[in-house]
């Protein structure tokens, strides 16, 4: 399974790992993904999603049906 948010489509970010001697090497910063069950009032059932924590905060303010 890819490390991608199913609603925002956020993916990993490339960054530099910097040592004490200032030597830089590439590394990945992964998205903070969580498994979440969300109730859809349109479909009248639970939907299992793998979404980022940013999306969880958005879903607390808006309904899942806004994104479907």
Swiss-Prot record:
GO CC annotations, alphabetized: chloroplast; ribonucleoprotein complex; ribosome
Enumerate the UniProt keywords alphabetically: Chloroplast, Plastid, Ribonucleoprotein, Ribosomal protein
One MF annotation (Gene Ontology) recorded for this entry: structural constituent of ribosome
Q: Please indicate if the UniProt record lists Cytoplasm as a keyword.
A: no
Query: Which InterPro entries has this protein been placed in?
Result: Ribosomal_bL28, Ribosomal_bL28/bL31-like_sf, Ribosomal_bL28_bact-type, Ribosomal_bL28_sf
> What is a biological process (GO) this protein takes part in?
translation
Q: Does the keyword Ribonucleoprotein apply?
A: yes
Q: Subcellular location, in the record's words?
A: Plastid, Chloroplast
Taken from the record, one Pfam family name reads Ribosomal_L28
User: Which family, according to the similarity comment?
Assistant: Belongs to the bacterial ribosomal protein bL28 family.
PANTHER family in the record: 39S RIBOSOMAL PROTEIN L28, MITOCHONDRIAL, LARGE RIBOSOMAL SUBUNIT PROTEIN BL28M
The name of this protein is Large ribosomal subunit protein bL28c
Q: Which organism is it from?
A: Galdieria sulphuraria (Red alga)
Q: What is the lineage of its organism?
A: Eukaryota, Rhodophyta, Bangiophyceae, Galdieriales, Galdieriaceae
